[in-house]
Amino acid sequence: MSFITAFRERVFIASGDLIRTFRISEETELKNFISWSKINPERIQKPSFDIEKELKAVEKRVILCLAHSNVLTTHGRRLVAVGTNEKQIHVFEYFVNDKGDIVTAEHIVTSVVPKAPTAIVFDKEDAYVVVGDRAGDVHRFSVLNGSAIEMAGAISMILDVAFSPDGKRLLMADRDEKVRALRYPATSVIDSFFLGHTEYVKTLAVQDNDSLWSSGGDKNLYNWSIAKCSAPRRTLDLSQFDAPIRKISINLQHKKIAVIFEKIETVVIVDLNQESLQTTSVSIVGESQCLDIASTKDYFAVLGRSTVHLIDLNNMEQKFVPIDEELTITLTSTNDAIDNLFKNVTHNNQQEYEKRKADKFEQIEKKKRRLNEDINGDDGEGPGPSNS
């Protein structure tokens, strides 16, 4: 798994167990963000839910998702969160000097999740990290102490999570062709379902509080009204590229969306300034596949199998960012955790769905029974008086 994200001029890349960073204005080689040896065992929050008592042992740590905080805190802190195949969520903070150089980075907290994480995002205030997992559950973790609560559950694997800019809606995309908008933090209230995709929904991009873009396996780009939740307002068919859509990223400053596809090197940039969506295709020089894409200021940052490119939205020119040999090897050799998200339609999917649903409800009932037992076992009545 390999990812790229950005905050202002700073870009972060995660691949395998590596985390690298660079500033766009410097155009220098990437630097190591933090060493895993800095993980403080005392800051690993023990899980409150019923999973393995010990942390999952893996042959090699692999990062499965990556996110950067939304705003600067009052002390100028920036936060980065990653989820790994150890079923852990690690939160780091870093500080910069007046020149924008990172002067220190340290481990804040680690939380343990029930299942392997698939998507991660900070809430509006950066007080919590929200994580979706393979089992269809969404948990929220405090960045201060790692405490966790379950926010939502589904039958299908969560593939992406996002927030509306006002922080009042949590948006979830899943493998069962749908997107949900949940009220936040009262996520027991589902405001709306967005139905129209015919294959899995892999990726979301939020334009404003009432404009959501989604895409995935059906090769279509959909635009939805979050408030009205009706049919898509705009649709763009990208099936001519003959590949599922891997990721979309929106640049609000230039009002453009970038689209990358599975296993091809083309980036499609969609101009949102006109009602009729206009597209421009950009082939990434010297690359065979685009793994991830992020937006920052005047650029789309594209992560490939062996390269990092910046697409300047003022002139559509590309800038090449040098990367080190270790990262190149990792980008080349690291594969997706799940290679194929399409459903197997060669057998009775209904039977499989009913089994997953029954298992999910059984887990919920177990949690309720355990909670009732805890309450009944702590009724405030101690042992009777002693006769001695």
UniProtKB/Swiss-Prot annotation:
The keyword Repeat applies. The keyword Nucleus applies. InterPro entries: Trm82, WD40/YVTN_repeat-like_dom_sf, WD40_rpt. It is found in: Nucleus. Pathway: tRNA modification; N(7)-methylguanine-tRNA biosynthesis. Keywords: Nucleus, Repeat, tRNA processing, WD repeat. Its main location: nucleus. PROSITE patterns: WD_REPEATS_REGION. WD repeats lie at residues 58-102, 112-151, 153-194, 196-234. GO terms for cellular component: cytosol; nucleus; tRNA methyltransferase complex. GO terms for biological process: tRNA (guanine-N7)-methylation; tRNA modification. Required for the formation of N(7)-methylguanine at position 46 (m7G46) in tRNA. In the complex, it is required to stabilize and induce conformational changes of the catalytic subunit. HAMAP family: TRM82. Forms a heterodimer with the catalytic subunit. Belongs to the WD repeat TRM82 family. This is tRNA (guanine-N(7)-)-methyltransferase non-catalytic subunit. The gene is wdr-4.
